[in-house]
């Protein structure tokens, strides 16, 4: 099993949920109003007058065989509009109870 953290501009909220539904990924935890800045060339997302945009984040636990398709869809969404931004991070899950 893998843990996938997807961090994205709030403009992509509906697209990310649609992506999870399309892949049959039912369970997730979502955080709104996530602040941050991309590691290469991303602008800050702070919810302030200067930097008004905000991010959201979704954490889901999936079977190994769903990870590649999920990452492929995230990449496709990022290529669609790289200015908006979306990234996915994957970790191994040792145990789940």
Spell out what each predicted region is.
Residues 1-97:
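Positively charged, small/polar-rich N-terminal and surface patches that mediate targeting and assembly
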